[in-house]
Each structure stands twice: as C-alpha cells, then as structure tokens.
C-alpha cells in the first residue's frame, strides 16, 4: 500500500549556501554549544560508536545539526593519536543529558532507535524523537533502499563520506575511534546534517494519510521496539507448550 502511494518524482532538496562543520574539543566551544542548544527547538542527531550492536556499542562521538549545512562533532572516545585533544566523556554527557532527555528539544536522525540504545548504555533516555529519515523514506518510497548513503544520493544529489573510505574493510578495518579527527568531524557532521535535511524534505511530499502514518504509527512503534529490545518480552510457556 505504501509503494502505491509514492509520488511520481521527487525533486532534490535545496542545498544550503554554506557548509560549516565544527569540531568541539574545548570547554569554550562546549559552552557555546550549550548556548545554542538552549535556543534550539530541533536538532539533527547522530552517534559514532565502536559497534553495530547497539547494546554493546561504546560512544566515540556525538554530532548535532542545527540547520542545513550547520553541524558540530564532539569527539569523546577517539584514540590519542587520532584526537590528541578531546573533552572528557562523562563531563560532556553530564552537560548534554538534560537536552537529550528533554521532550521540548526535538531530535531528528537516521535510525534513531540505534542511537537511543547507545545513549541508554550511558544512562541517558533519549526523548523528543520527532523525525527519522529512514522511516520517512519507508513511508514515501518503501520499494527503495533506506540507508543514509542511498538517501543522500537520491534526495540531496550528494555522495557521502563512506565508512569504508575512512575505516577500510575486512581484516584490515580499523575502529572509528582511530579515524583522524578532521575526517571524523566531516563524516559525523554529515550524518546529522543529511538526516535533518532528508527528513524535512521527505515530509513535504507526504499526504495527510502518510503523515499520520509516519507520526502516529512508525515513530511510536519504533519507540515500542526500543523498549522491547531493551527489556525483552515475556512468553507464556504453557500457551506455547
């Protein structure tokens, strides 16, 4: 049913006039970021980690986008070789926790359920999830791929910095924690920026029924799945016997 409801063609999202991806690795820069968060109503959000298994993943960094082309990256778990200067993870999370847990600051991302698990590993319950580019893509174009690389090509007309180009593949693949901080900043900032742009773009093409399905079914179900994955489910053994 979703595929039948897709629009005939989607135009590319407009490109921002400038691109500003900023590294946050000093206390002064962090203070400026907190001031920006105080004034923000919505952000693009992404986490960089050590594993695709969200339950086991450790934070390497957090990126946030405030507007198209405007994003920051906070390295938290890079190796000293990759990032000689970075802020203390516990200190940063302590400052960010009220914003991440606030339901008044809306968060948009790409498969945010993963990031929700990662942050929960550190005692942070991500609230205010209002958009997910992956789920928006499923509503509009269920027959196509929903990965961020594909979405960026399709809707922004842009190639992304691929994970493999930074970390390699196979036996020689390195951890994201070992990626040079300049490269990591661009990669992570792109993730938050592109997710923010793509989600807003796709939402413009949703009709009333699709928007209702997106906001009242897909996003709430993702939260239910998070709870189920986190806590497990009870099984009636007698009923199954």
Language-model segments: which ranges?
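Long, highly charged low-complexity segments
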Residues: 1-62, 76-99
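Active-site-proximal helix-loop-helix substrate-binding element of RNase H-like nuclease domains
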Residues: 19, 60-207, 217, 221-225, ...
């Amino acid at each position: 049913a979703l595929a039948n409801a897709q629009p005939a063609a989607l135009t590319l999202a407009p490109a921002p006039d400038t691109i500003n991806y900023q590294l946050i690795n000093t206390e002064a820069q962090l203070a400026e970021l907190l001031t920006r968060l105080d004034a923000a109503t919505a952000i693009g959000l992404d986490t960089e980690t050590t594993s695709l298994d969200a339950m086991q993943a450790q934070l390497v960094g957090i990126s946030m986008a405030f507007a198209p082309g405007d994003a920051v990256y906070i390295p938290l778990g890079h190796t000293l070789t990759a990032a000689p200067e970075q802020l203390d993870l516990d200190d940063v999370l302590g400052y960010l926790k009220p914003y991440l847990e606030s339901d008044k600051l809306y968060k948009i991302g790409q498969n945010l359920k993963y990031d929700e698990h990662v942050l929960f590993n550190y005692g942070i319950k991500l609230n205010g999830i209002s958009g997910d580019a992956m789920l928006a893509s499923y509503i509009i174009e269920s027959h196509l791929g929903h990965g961020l690389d594909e979405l960026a090509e399709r809707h922004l007309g842009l190639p992304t910095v691929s994970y493999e180009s930074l970390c390699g593949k196979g036996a020689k693949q390195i951890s994201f924690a070992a990626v040079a901080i300049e490269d990591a900043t661009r990669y992570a900032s792109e993730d938050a920026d592109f997710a923010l742009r793509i989600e807003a773009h796709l939402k413009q093409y949703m009709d009333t029924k699709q928007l209702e399905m997106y906001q009242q079914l897909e996003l709430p179900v993702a939260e239910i799945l998070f709870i189920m994955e986190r806590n497990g489910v009870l099984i009636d053994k007698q009923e199954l016997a």
